[in-house]
Amino acid sequence: MRRYARITGTGSYLPPRRLTNHDLAAELAQRGIETSDEWIVERTGIHARHFAAPDVASSDLALEASKKALEAAGCQPQDIDLIIVATSTPDMVFPSTACILQNKLGANGCAAFDVQAVCSGFVYALTVADAMIQSGAASRALVVGSEVFSRILDFNDRTTCVLFGDGAGAVVLEASEQPGILASDLHADGKHVGILCVPGNVSGGQVLGDPLLKMDGQAVFKLAVGVLEKAARATLDKAGLTDADIDWLIPHQANIRIMQSTARKLKLSMDKVVVTVDQHGNTSAASIPLALDHGVRNGQVKPGQTVLLEGVGGGFTWGAVLLKM
């Protein structure tokens, strides 16, 4: 009998500190940087975001989201035999944030590692976990996206610092006799490294290069819309389904314009798109599981529905996962 994987629980966590656009504009004004609620909303659809306290790390946010996902799945940390954390803001250079999370959670002994594909990280991590469960290498996986992007933002650059927030989302993925993950499609193109990156690195005890995020927003937008449509169609083709079979689209919550363009290309109304970017901002690898959990807990996303997850991020990376809840 073929072995499949399905999501049995979701969870998410946002740090308590919430900054509206007005709050952020006031803080930036002290640096001599001008912006406004109107300017941010018009270009991004973002109204607010959450920032973690200075002593809070990605693993701390991941821990809270994981606890909620485990509770929703009705299992204990000791029941998990695989932990994958998608993050581009790890606690340390090494070991992995997954290992740190494992210890905080009390799930010691299982396999644990990080996946780094920036904002595409969660769809990459979910695809890897699905493959490991299908192969028999794992039976119950905890897949997490967690970020503290506030640590790598250049608050002198209003075109980027207004976009991002901190948060975490998690799912429990279990072996199943019935398909849950229906298909996936992952890609990358390294020639676009420079359009979204943090170019600095640690060497000899020093940070060499710029340690803050750099982005060519127009280049990212143009590339993202095209590759997201292709990934969606490839994933649907693999599953033998069409646009009409999608109950919910949960894209990476980067920018409302990218999300609207993707929905149009897939002939979906925005009523079928789970949107959290307005209140969370862009939380990178955390954005998709955060939005999924939001949709589940507010009653939008229901058992048996077909959901398309899509991510796009630095690298340049992109991908999609089609699943049945």
UniProtKB/Swiss-Prot annotation:
Q: Name one GO biological process term.
A: fatty acid biosynthetic process
Regions annotated as coiled coil = none
Which GO CC terms are listed, alphabetically?
cytoplasm
User: Please, which domain of life does this record's source organism belong to?
Assistant: Bacteria
E.C. number? 2.3.1.180
Region (ACP-binding) residue spans: 253-257
Q: Which GO terms describe its molecular function?
A: 3-oxoacyl-[acyl-carrier-protein] synthase activity; beta-ketoacyl-acyl-carrier-protein synthase III activity
Q: What is its main location?
A: cytoplasm
Q: Which family does it belong to?
A: Belongs to the thiolase-like superfamily. FabH family.
Task: Supply the domain comment.
Answer: The last Arg residue of the ACP-binding site is essential for the weak association between ACP/AcpP and FabH.
Its function?
Answer: Catalyzes the condensation reaction of fatty acid synthesis by the addition to an acyl acceptor of two carbons from malonyl-ACP. Catalyzes the first condensation reaction which initiates fatty acid synthesis and may therefore play a role in governing the total rate of fatty acid production. Possesses both acetoacetyl-ACP synthase and acetyl transacylase activities. Its substrate specificity determines the biosynthesis of branched-chain and/or straight-chain of fatty acids.
Q: How does it assemble?
A: Homodimer.
Q: Which PANTHER family match?
A: 3-OXOACYL-[ACYL-CARRIER-PROTEIN] SYNTHASE 3, BETA-KETOACYL-[ACYL-CARRIER-PROTEIN] SYNTHASE III
Question: What protein am I looking at?
Answer: Beta-ketoacyl-[acyl-carrier-protein] synthase III
- This chain's source organism reads Delftia acidovorans (strain DSM 14801 / SPH-1)
Taxonomic placement? Bacteria, Pseudomonadati, Pseudomonadota, Betaproteobacteria, Burkholderiales
Gene name, Swiss-Prot/TrEMBL:
fabH
